[in-house]
Amino acid sequence: MKAIAVEPGAGTPTLIDLPVPEPAPGEALVRTLRVGVDGTDDEVIAGAHGGVPDGDDRLVLGHEAVGVVEDANGTDLEEGQYVVPTVRRPPPGVETNVYFERGEPDMAPEGEYVERGIVGAHGFMAEYFTSPADCLVPISADLAPVGFLVEPISITEKAIEHAAATRSAFDWRPESVFVLGNGSLGLLTAAMFRTTMGYDRVYCLGRRDRPHPSIDILDELGVTYIDSRETPVPEVPEVYEPMDLVYEATGYAKHAFESIEALAPNGVAALLGVPNDWSFEVDGGRLHREMVLHNKAIVGSVNSNRDQFASAVDTLAGLPSWVIEDVVSGVYGLEEYERAFSDPTDDATADDDTTIKTAVEFSNI
């Protein structure tokens, strides 16, 4: 079978041949339909994040997948059933651990998990993959063409759930929401806040010039676009309004601290971006004081569990179809898989790029 893999330091993915995997007891064989590409894939390809499986010299990419059960292999799944795989698995040689037993692999610390297509385990960018049946979340046939969006939406499901949990000790009624980042994850999240969650006052930060497809989506949704070059995050409360909930999806390290200043009293910021090391000065005393005197909170969030995947399926079904169509910039077959990935040699900057979300198609739906 064909697969898309990367070798450490290579900087570009390649198409390779691998044998079709054999499902172990409790596993199903899945025929891959489509696999999404996101910023994590770019980081893995660049060697800035992740790692190959033990004893291997390359990593099969892909963690945002949708497929169809080819061989149920005695599990409760049915052949022909559409499924989306979760990402985390126990480390090699470990059948399970307390985090997986609790159904909370997303809360496992480093060393207690591997992530398919990211670190320590091959991903889903292959014509077939195997997976434990309990790591496969059913999805309807009508959602299968965009099922690769379930994983990123599940990331937001968890972040919102955990942010709300920090406010559960009192009667918290958020009205204003601020999404930092107008990439694919930020756009999907802004769409969730406006449509399936029903927020009226939603703002989204970016640094792109009009016209741009991402800003067009925000305008159509009724989300206020804020250009960070004109209004930096700390100035947002004065120019617009203080925010009850800030959702950070930029990976820009200063935003972790600036989010505190953007929050309204009793607000919470959820941080999802993963920045590189960066030293800079902050007024720690002022930020500490802001959090204490105004009951503010910050929560970090990574990965998601099966329940959040299931919620993401429902959310995806509730999003307007036009949003999905506009977010997905292109789906490319194996003969042109390179087009789905960012080109590190391209002179065009991210600000000029009109691509929002891409995917590789391995099999017709």
Swiss-Prot record:
GO terms for biological process: non-phosphorylated glucose catabolic process. Zn(2+) binds at D38, H63, E64, E151. Substrate binds at T40, E115, E151, N303. The gene is gdh1. SUPFAM superfamilies: GroES-like, NAD(P)-binding Rossmann-fold domains. Belongs to the zinc-containing alcohol dehydrogenase family. Glucose 1-dehydrogenase subfamily. The keyword Transcription does not apply. It catalyses: D-glucose + NAD(+) = D-glucono-1,5-lactone + NADH + H(+); D-glucose + NADP(+) = D-glucono-1,5-lactone + NADPH + H(+). One of its GO terms (molecular function) is NADP+ binding. It comes from the Archaea. NADP(+) binds at N182, G183, S184, L185, R207, R208, L272, G273, V274, S301, V302, N303. The lineage of its organism: Archaea, Methanobacteriati, Methanobacteriota, Stenosarchaea group, Halobacteria. This is Glucose 1-dehydrogenase 1. Keywords: Carbohydrate metabolism, Metal-binding, NAD, NADP, Nucleotide-binding, Oxidoreductase, Zinc. Its EC number is 1.1.1.47. It holds the Pfam family ADH_N. Catalyzes the NAD(P)(+)-dependent oxidation of D-glucose to D-gluconate via gluconolactone. Can utilize both NAD(+) and NADP(+) as electron acceptor. Is involved in the degradation of glucose through a modified Entner-Doudoroff pathway.
